Amino acid sequence: MFRTCTKIGTVPKVLVNQKGLIDGLRRVTTDATTSRANPAHVPEEHDKPFPVKLDDSVFEGYKIDVPSTEIEVTKGELLGLYEKMVTIRRLELACDALYKAKKIRGFCHLSIGQEAVAAGIEGAITLDDSIITSYRCHGFAYTRGLSIRSIIGELMGRQCGASKGKGGSMHIFAKNFYGGNGIVGAQIPLGAGIGFAQKYLEKPTTTFALYGDGASNQGQAFEAFNMAKLWGLPVIFACENNKYGMGTSAERSSAMTEFYKRGQYIPGLLVNGMDVLAVLQASKFAKKYTVENSQPLLMEFVTYRYGGHSMSDPGTTYRSREEVQKVRAARDPIEGLKKHIMEWGVANANELKNIEKRIRGMVDEEVRIAEESPFPDPIEESLFSDVYVAGTEPAYARGRNSLEYHQYK
């Protein structure tokens, strides 16, 4: 009965043309340098907006009109986005070095190459909006307002860490940032729950529930989509499609790889996740749509991770080194924005070099402070403290060890 089936293991080739378009699957570009602006229209003032034209192929919609490709930005916004992305990359490179020096143990998932997604989303929302994501969370933790030392300290298990050194890489939290989640796809229904709370409290805010292409096949994703549509929740389900779920390409694991269409009855938006300006514009559009209509939206950011799935994965057994080098050389999100900044006269190479030098020094100093922070006290009580944010603890708790049969305060 299976004679007519395609042989297991054969998948269509994914071809990338010179413009960065993925042939045969989708029309969105992954080029980070397609935006256009006239340098003559760029004002001297850092807070005065000027027009930028995004490429027509940075968006693709499903049951929804795509955002306008005519946007306005300021010098200050562009430099702020550049600083955010450079800081995230320096943070992740520091994590890489500390892990290899065995100062970070356990799980550690880096987002080098995906910086435009975190920076662009944060630039489009406020700190009153919420974000929940997967274990690849360091960049989002930083954009949500955590210090570098609190992130690095958490990874090294130090008291200065965001979770007092007891959560590790996958369990980092801040106000309106709900992690870092260690279970694949677990954050998707939790994101729907945050959206429910926002609607119940009548807040004009939205939630970004981010997950990867690998997690998109989890059953709980579809359950969350259904409830969000049924109840009209202001949630943006955002898939960071970095092409590989652990070591399996999307084409080998998913019968349908257009993840922005997975909601069926929920509109979707495909976005060039390597272009921070496209991410910024799409995220502004998504927030406006979900808040004003009290409805969910699916998004897919087409991006790429340079490293392996985690620090224990070299990332070269299921893809070639040439593939990674080609993307890094041609479509790097930081280099793409850097090119625009210089071409449009926002800043020159020397000014950008000074920014990079300042960020490198800041990250190095934060790492030094984190390394000097002590470990949690090696006593039994430490295992059961810092479960809740100070001031939010329940009046009573029980069952923290086998001898506690009664409630206690």
From Swiss-Prot:
GO terms for biological process: aerobic respiration; pyruvate decarboxylation to acetyl-CoA. Mg(2+) binds at D213, N242, Y244. InterPro entries: DH_E1, PDH_E1_Alpha_Subunit, Pyrv_DH_E1_asu_subgrp-y, THDP-binding. The modification Phosphoserine is found at S310, S312. Keywords: Magnesium, Metal-binding, Mitochondrion, Oxidoreductase, Phosphoprotein, Pyruvate, Thiamine pyrophosphate, Transit peptide. Its EC number is 1.2.4.1. It is found in: Mitochondrion matrix. E1 activity is regulated by phosphorylation (inactivation) and dephosphorylation (activation) of the alpha subunit. The keyword tRNA processing does not apply. It is an enzyme of class 1 (oxidoreductase). This is Pyruvate dehydrogenase E1 component subunit alpha, mitochondrial. It comes from Schizosaccharomyces pombe (strain 972 / ATCC 24843) (Fission yeast). The gene is pda1.
